[in-house]
């Protein structure tokens, strides 16, 4: 679904991307869907999906700080793909204590 890339905050090419640019690039490559560039813009499109109804491809949003948001792509089975500021593009689990405590909501944008 996604190309492997290193992470650089604010990056927009495949040598490094932030979380929202990664999601934008994957959606363009995989689904030919044009998403907005920033997390603040991405969280306003599509519609919210209940936790139990989330499906592969839905966006998953987190509140990681007072004004900081993070976005990834849900893959199913409690797993999501995202660009981490410290580890690059990785798979993580929603039941990981950190992600569980910062989970905000899912959105379907397809």
Which residues fall in each region the model found?
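Aromatic- and glycine-rich peptidoglycan recognition patches
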Residues: 33, 75-110
């Amino acid at each position: 679904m996604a190309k492997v890339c290193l992470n650089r905050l604010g990056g927009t090419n495949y040598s490094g991307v932030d979380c929202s640019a990664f999601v934008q690039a994957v959606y363009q490559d995989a689904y030919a869907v044009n998403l907005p560039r920033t997390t603040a813009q991405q969280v306003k499109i599509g519609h919210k999906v209940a936790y139990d109804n989330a499906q592969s491809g839905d966006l998953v949003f987190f509140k990681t700080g007072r004004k900081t948001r993070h976005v990834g792509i849900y893959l199913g089975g409690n797993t999501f793909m995202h660009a981490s500021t410290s580890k690059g593009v990785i798979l993580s689990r929603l039941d990981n204590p950190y992600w569980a405590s910062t989970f905000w909501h899912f959105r379907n944008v397809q």
